[in-house]
Amino acid sequence: WVTAAHERGLQLHAWINPYRITIDGEDEWNAIPDSSPAKQHPEWVVKYNDNYYFNPGIPAVQQLVVDGAAEIVKNYDVDGIHLDDYFYPGTDFADEATYERYGQDFSRIGDWRRDNVNTLIAALDETLHTLDKNLSFGVSPAGIWENKSANSKGSNTQGQSSYSELYCDSLQWINAGTVDYICPQLYWSIGFEPADFQTLVKWWQKAVSTSDVALYIGIGAYRSAEAQPGDTWYGTDEIERQLTLLDDSIDIQGEVFFSYASLESIDGCPAFLTTHYAEDKPVTKPDTDNSGTITQEEAQQQATLLDMLSRFIVSLFR
């Protein structure tokens, strides 16, 4: 993957889901080998809604995640580390005993949980940039930091709160400079009243406006792939509207589509995106010594839709 990406002048960012162990319940859990840290240390694991998660409040678990990311950077010539939005899965996470042991400095469990995530982000920032100062480190949090009804700093929305329900304080990461970029998952349409795409774009623009943190916008292409005739997301119209809005916006370095497989399956989308990105500055190879044998002409011939999406598409994991 690294070689193939670099031969085509693309960056490759390793995608990490920091705490989630399973997504398919007991069958997946039973298939995990005994050598896994999850099986070696069952005291690190919390069951939540039939799935299993590492407990973010345990310092050894935080170190496990940091060490895992560092192992990737040490052994592979990746250009970045990208964390998904799954930290705490919900408010009723069974970590009261962990809070009693490690949370003495916090009067509220929510503040302690957010501090655990902040501590992980800061540790990753320091460790990864010590290994490679040019590495990009970022997170794609859920699109709503907090609703204005709960916090005056929040957005005019009525959706799931990353701050209160998933314990991700992405504003803290931006203000502390512990991420190089932020990529909020704005998987709603323009005009969707509970969580309007344009409203959230403006909120995130303001959030990064006084920082050095780059802003990329996550677009829910999977919604178009799953849409039926008559739906707002059906076809390419909604994606086109969102890209037009982003093209006219400041403080936005690009967009990330979830997912690449979805883009390929939407009727007319590959052709539209090829045209849309055709006038962008061509992708240039990273300033590294990638000793592939592919020629410039061969690279051009082998180019796919991904090569045209030069504005930082990292969603290759589906």
Name every feature range the model reports, one short phrase each.
Residues 11-19, 82-83, 113-162, 214-222:
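Aromatic-lined carbohydrate-recognition surfaces of secreted/lumenal glycan-active proteins
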Residues 20-49, 86-105, 150-159, 231:
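Aromatic- and acidic-residue-enriched segments that line the glycan-binding/catalytic groove
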Residues 167-171, 175-193, 210-287:
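Substrate-binding cleft of secreted/luminal carbohydrate-active enzymes
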Residues 291:
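Acidic carboxylate motifs that coordinate Ca2+ or other divalent cations, activating on Asp/Glu
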